[in-house]
Amino acid sequence: MSHENERAGTRQWTGLAVLVLPCVLASMDMSVMFVTLPSLTVDLRPSGSELLWIMDAYGFLLAGLLITMGTLGDRIGRRRVLLTGAAAFGLASTLAAWASSPEMLIATRALMGIAGATLAPSTLALIRNLFHDDRQRATAVGIWTAGFAGGAVVGPIVGGLLLEHFWWGSVFLINIPVMALLLCLGPLLLPEFRDPEPGSRFDLLGALLSLVAVLAVIYGIKTTAEHGIGWAGAGSLLAGMTAGALFLHRQRATPNAMINITLFRTRWFNVPLLIDALATFAMVGFSLFNWQFMQLVLGMSPLKSALWSLPTFLVMPVGIALAAGMAPRVGKPRVMTAGLLVAAAGYVGLTLIRPDSGILHLVCALTVVSLGIAGVAAIVTDVILSAAPPERAGAASSLAETSAEFGGALGIAILGSIGTAVYRAQMGSSAPANLTPEQLASAEATLGGAIDTARTLPAGAAEALRNAAFDAFIRELRIAAVLSAVLTVGGALLIARTLRPARTRTADLGPAPDRGRAPA
């Protein structure tokens, strides 16, 4: 049996479990802060600006260093980078748990982001080394994808349960035993792999430019979404795009490039990257609305709403299994197309939500979306990894993760901004006429502001304001669902037109082993 078609055994699947666990935690640490903020705010008393940095420091540094860490793993060894990052992540988590000031918590969250940036590209690249059979690798990547997505879902649940019995720092301590397990089992189960010809030296300037580009663009998107178009957001976006252009120019010119620009010349690499960003754009962007619907319209607690979101996670293995089983028979492009169309059907279901719709309507529609996206994400990531040479798998996986980060940031910014504009426009014409200017401004700002304002009004006026706010919010939710459906259908059409497998590749129906790939 050739090495390319060698099937994985118990050792490889156990190694996959070891790889998935830290990624679950890295994803959890992004979402767990939503339920932790009230408790730590009382204890540490951060300012408004400090509170934002407590939330953002982790995600910003993680996104900004993905490309650097993926390339570093290709050069010095993926297992080495992973285990070093795991040790640093555990140490930073310990410091965060006992942070005694907002500044200390911000610093430790930043350290966690730096360490967390080693996890995704290293684990994905190691999956490429562990699984050589196409179908098994697609399944393994799907399990990894479900773990990463599932961490964001279970984070608020785990956080809520811990905070009922322990102090806020306990949400960070759960990272330590998992990282310790990785440090113990990783050397035994995970193979080491590095580029045999990494070049003479590491491109430090390129790493700095990539960091500035990603951080500045994401910060500019976030600032523009929160405060509207202004000098800070526009300046940050301009600086990020300039740094990005300089980074790409340097990658073409230097012999020690972090990424091989010629990868982008093949449709089997650039189209899946775009699909990854589009799917994340829609799913992450729409999450702004489904959480508000559960907590503000239906009146659920954060823990209860997180529990109701579990079906969207539990259905992911089904989507992954279906995608992995269908890909060898009908081809990866058709599986991705079908997954996007299934997700679009779920978004269409979300356009039918009304203020009096129950939780089952929302959960069923979101579960359909999750079913489709799970299969797409697994196959898309596998296609991206397969399009790159094995010695560049770390850089390829980091680009896949970076595209997803950008997609999520853009989804929140663009869908959030459009939704806010729709909500304010409708509230401006439908809010009760007897509100004071201050009350009207609060009610027009957000749904939460309208609900808080309603608590200060007489019963009749409060009911009228709540109804107007609910109607305005449902309208913005429906528009976000329509846009998400259009994007996913557009992605399906793009795949159908651009990714046409060669008829001779009946076993894989994906990118050919060498044709169209960039040289090492």
Report residues per predicted region:
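Transmembrane-helix exit segments and adjacent C-terminal regions of multi-pass membrane proteins
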Residues: 2-17, 21, 27, 382, ...
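Transmembrane core module of solute transporters
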Residues: 16-61, 167, 232-235, 243, ...
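C-terminal module of multi-pass small-molecule transporters
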Residues: 17, 77-86, 102-103, 119-123, ...
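Interfacial helix-cap and linker-helix signal at transmembrane-aqueous boundaries
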Residues: 40-41, 72-73, 158-166, 221, ...
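MFS 12-TM fold signature
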Residues: 62, 88-96, 112, 178-182, ...
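Hydrophobic transmembrane-helix bundles of small-molecule transporters
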Residues: 142, 164-282, 289, 300-302, ...
